[in-house]
A protein has these predicted regions:
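OB-fold and OB-like single-stranded nucleic-acid-recognition modules
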Residues: 17-131
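Bacterial N-terminal signal peptides
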Residues: 7-13
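Positively charged n-region of N-terminal signal peptides that target proteins for export
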Residues: 1-4
Length: 131
């Protein structure tokens, strides 16, 4: 019995350690309040507008649970398009940017890093990852 428990513990530990980041909605809100442009964020979102393709990017607006509205800039030359529509739920992992205005958004939502994207990101929709 001890061997069975030990044998099951290792795969479960690896799965837990190798998983994706969990949403931190309050952390995102604090990063916005603190103007932490460049922060790595993972958060729940509701799609406010259907994605629009423009210049190799899919752009759309989302609302987080705190009520913040963000622009998502998803590079479709590095990642698959997200087949979502207004009202759909997403989980987004990427880099926060805050431009003058202020315009708040997230980019670097792709697995393949590029200049300006220090880490990989993704968008989860209906248990599928677009990265």
């Amino acid at each position: 019995m001890k061997r069975l428990c030990f044998a099951l513990t290792i795969p479960l530990a690896l799965l837990a350690c190798g998983g994706r980041e969990m949403p931190d909605d309050q952390g995102l809100h604090q990063d916005i309040v603190n103007s932490s442009s460049g922060a790595e964020v993972t958060f729940d979102a509701t799609l406010l507008s259907d994605p629009v393709e423009s210049g190799g990017h899919e752009r759309f607006q989302v609302k987080d649970p705190a009520g913040d509205i963000l622009e998502i800039d998803h590079n479709t030359t590095l990642a698959a398009s997200v087949p979502a529509h207004a009202g759909d739920a997403l989980v987004i992992h990427g880099q926060l940017y805050i431009d003058p205005g202020p315009r708040v958004g997230v980019h670097c939502t792709h697995a393949e890093t590029s200049s300006g994207c220090p880490y990989s990101g993704w968008i989860e929709f209906q248990n599928n990852y677009y990265e």
